[in-house]
């Protein structure tokens, strides 16, 4: 439950000056001067470095003051909600589980008094909390969009011994408004290894990002280490694995972790990890380094894991971690690719300015087959191209003189829009494409880009696939799905089983929309380990471009600069590389901190490797 309403608060400010710096502690909770309970509005966004602390209940506070003070205390940076518990009776405090869930409302919860339940004694009150749900963070700290009305009841009783009002019954978890949630919580990726995907073309293990929300100013390092040790969240668990032995946790008595002045983090573990060998230990340390990389201002450069007796299990630096698993910027490609005015596949170096693109080596760059779309493998050795009419898919080598064989997939759709989508390569070298033929719409997979196409099972798909983008990890897939004239962006989990004949049985499970507020999604692309860039439109609105997380949340930071008439978008999972789009101005590029720049007027279908 959370409070908001800056105008009502009597903020307590303490400035502690050290040299030229200052640390500001800002109190968030105060009591209304009267017994009337006003709506709890959203707190304005505050500086990320400001710590917010709650005020305890004042003597002889009225029931309305207790409820509002408790709601505001929930939005503070109190590590264990100790101040919030002062508003509860002893029994209620023991039964309350604030970490069970966090419900996010459009505005702060609005408390409305109910009739006094005991009119004769007047020693109890009840308040109904109402609001509009936006999202929920579960006990595993996983975020999910939500909608509908929120209702919860807070009951108070007059304590006979003290004569003070206290809350004796309340909903489990916490509830707060959107702006308080954004101020209090931070989205961070935990990293695990893909469990059912072959190693990538480099032979390295592949990492999978598992985004969770933790309280950003309440010891986030310890929180993230603890959450990583617990294993993947429920949605990701079937396709991801941890190198930490089951039930591994922090050594008993260890309550806080912090890197030293050399950015080295020491992590004492319990007995479950005592007998781990070095090879496994380095994978464990790599998971920690990937997870903690961007969590602190200076980062974590080295991790030391310790046994329960304090001896060193292993240590690992950042460079060594990158050699263990493909991760982050190691996935980036050398070129941007698109289709030029002659319907050839061409490429342009990401660092080039004002230079004309070059046709790719091989048949797809020679113009023998006119193309409307293409995809380049992540190692930039092979490419797939869709014929200009959308009916055929070809795969060819990006080597000078390489020929092009017969089409590997055909669509019988009667119009271009009812034929093949732009294809997509995963990190294991498999090729994906959707056939939009209304008579036989299907999602297809070509293992290593060749052989007989495998039809992928989509048991809960409600609509037709209009676009496909597979994440580099090979375990998550983004789909634009059309149904009844509306389109949505959905994320699914890729599960693979090998049959007796060694052919894979592949399914897309637990599809869920990550853009419920958009009525139309025009284009999308992966733009990070757990982030996508989306072009779409809200009901009655205009086209816009935004970033969205795979869990449906909005990442911190600004949206891309606006651009008119965007039809296609391409981003790299290396977030340092520019966005590339096809708009009414042709192929355009957006580098960080810059404006959109025209690359080529006669060009379409931009892509990065993948």
From Swiss-Prot:
Cellular compartments annotated: Cell membrane
One GO cellular component term: plasma membrane
Lipid-substituted positions (N-palmitoyl cysteine): 28
Keywords from the UniProt entry: Cell membrane, Lipoprotein, Membrane, Palmitate, Signal
Lipidation residue positions, type S-diacylglycerol cysteine: 28
Pfam name, any one: Germane
Bilayer topology term: Lipid-anchor
Family from the record: Belongs to the LpqB lipoprotein family.
Protein name: Lipoprotein LpqB
Originating species: Streptomyces avermitilis (strain ATCC 31267 / DSM 46492 / JCM 5070 / NBRC 14893 / NCIMB 12804 / NRRL 8165 / MA-4680)
């Amino acid at each position: 439950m959370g409070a908001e309403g800056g105008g009502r608060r009597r903020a307590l400010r303490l400035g502690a000056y050290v040299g030229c710096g200052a640390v500001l502690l800002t109190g968030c909770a105060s009591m209304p001067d009267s017994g009337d309970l006003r709506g709890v509005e959203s707190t304005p966004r505050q500086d990320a470095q400001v710590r917010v602390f709650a005020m305890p209940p004042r003597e002889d506070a009225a029931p309305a003051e207790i409820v509002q003070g408790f709601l505001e205390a929930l939005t503070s940076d109190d590590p264990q909600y100790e101040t919030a518990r002062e508003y509860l009776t002893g029994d209620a405090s023991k039964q309350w589980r604030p970490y069970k869930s966090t419900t996010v409302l459009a505005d702060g919860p609005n408390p409305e008094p109910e009739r006094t339940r005991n009119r004769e004694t007047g020693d109890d009150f009840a308040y109904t909390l109402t609001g509009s749900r936006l999202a929920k963070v579960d006990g595993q700290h996983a975020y999910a969009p939500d909608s509908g009305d929120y209702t919860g009841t807070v009951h108070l009783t007059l304590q006979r011994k003290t004569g003070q009002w206290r809350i004796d019954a309340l909903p489990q978890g916490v509830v707060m408004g959107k702006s308080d949630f954004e101020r209090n919580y931070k989205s961070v990726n935990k990293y695990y290894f893909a469990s059912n995907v072959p190693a990538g073309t480099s032979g390295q293990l592949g990492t999978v990002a598992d985004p969770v929300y933790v309280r950003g100013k309440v010891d986030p390092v310890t929180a993230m280490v603890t959450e990583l040790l617990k294993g993947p969240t429920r949605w990701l668990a079937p396709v991801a694995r941890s190198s930490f032995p089951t039930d591994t946790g922090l050594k008993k008595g260890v309550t806080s972790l912090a890197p030293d002045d050399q950015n080295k983090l020491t992590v004492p573990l319990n007995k479950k990890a005592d007998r781990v060998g070095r090879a496994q230990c380095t994978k464990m340390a790599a998971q920690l380094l990937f997870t903690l990389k961007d969590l602190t201002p200076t980062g974590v450069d080295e991790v030391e894991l310790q046994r329960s007796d304090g001896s060193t299990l292993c240590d690992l630096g950042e460079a060594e971690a990158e050699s263990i698993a493909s991760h982050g910027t190691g996935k980036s490609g050398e070129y941007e690719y698109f289709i030029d005015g002659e319907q050839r596949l061409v490429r342009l170096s990401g660092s080039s300015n004002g230079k004309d693109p070059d046709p790719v080596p091989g048949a797809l760059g020679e113009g023998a087959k006119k193309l409307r779309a293409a995809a380049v493998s992540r190692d930039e050795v092979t490419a797939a191209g869709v014929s200009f009419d959308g009916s055929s898919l070809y795969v060819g080598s990006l080597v000078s003189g390489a020929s092009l064989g017969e089409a590997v997939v055909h669509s019988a759709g009667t119009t271009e829009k009812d034929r093949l989508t732009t294809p997509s390569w995963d990190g294991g070298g498999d090729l994906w494409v959707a056939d939009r033929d209304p008579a036989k719409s299907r999602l297809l997979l070509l293992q290593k880009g060749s052989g007989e196409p495998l039809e992928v099972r989509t048991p809960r798909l409600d609509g037709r696939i209009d676009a496909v983008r597979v994440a580099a990890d090979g375990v998550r897939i983004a789909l634009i799905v059309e149904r009844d004239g509306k389109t949505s962006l959905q994320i699914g989990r890729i599960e693979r089983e090998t049959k007796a004949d060694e052919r894979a049985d592949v399914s897309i499970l637990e599809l869920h929309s990550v853009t419920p507020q958009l009525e139309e999604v025009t284009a999308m692309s992966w733009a990070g380990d757990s982030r996508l860039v989306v072009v779409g439109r809200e009901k009655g609105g205009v086209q816009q471009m935004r970033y969205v997380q795979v869990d449906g949340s909005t990442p911190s930071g600004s949206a891309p600069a606006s651009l008119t008439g965007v039809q296609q978008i391409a981003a790299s999972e290396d977030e340092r590389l520019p966005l590339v789009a096809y708009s009414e101005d042709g192929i355009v590029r957006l580098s960080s901190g810059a404006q959109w720049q025209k690359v080529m007027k006669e060009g379409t279908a931009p892509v990065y490797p993948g």
